[in-house]
Amino acid sequence: RENILGGRGQGFNMGQHRLAYGRLRHGMHNVAMAQRALDLAAAHVVQRETFGKRLADRQGVRWMMADCAAEIYKARLMLLHIAYKAEKGMDLRQENGIAKVFLANMVHQVVDTAIQLHGALGYSHDTPLARWYTGIRSQRLVDGPDEVHRWRTGANVIKAFEKYGTTASACGGELFE
C-alpha cells in the first residue's frame, strides 16, 4: 500500500497524463522531420532540371511544395495550442487525440511528397527519406492506432454538441483561454 503512486484506481489517469506530454514531444519530432523532408525536397527541385526547366519552376511541383508547407504550418499551430494548454494545466486529451492522428498522417504525407519530388533518388539510400518513410509508419500505431483516436474524438464531438449545442469545445475550444 505504501508503494501506490497517486490514489487507488488512479494509475490509468496518471498514465494518460504522461502520454499527453509524450505525444506533444512526438508531435514536435514529426514537425521537425517534415520540415527537414521539405528542405531536402526544396534543395533537390531547385537544382534538378527536366526537359530544360528546373523542377522548382513547374506549377505542379510548386503546388506540392505549397501543400506541404500548409500542412507543416497547421501542425505547428496545433502544437503551439497544445503546449499553451499544457502550460496552463488544462485538459489536453481531446486536442492530443486530434493532434496524434493529424501529425502522424502529416509527416507521412510530407515525407511521401519529398520522395516523389526526388524521384527514384528519394527511395534510394542516398537520402534519409526512404528510411524515414518506413519508420514513420509506426507513428499511426504507437500510443493507440488512428482509428481509436478518431473514434474517441468523434464521440467527444457528439458529446459536446449534445451538451452545449456546439462542437467548438471538441475542436480545440477557445484558442487561448
Predicted feature residues:
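Alpha-helical interface subdomain recognition
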Residues: 3-177
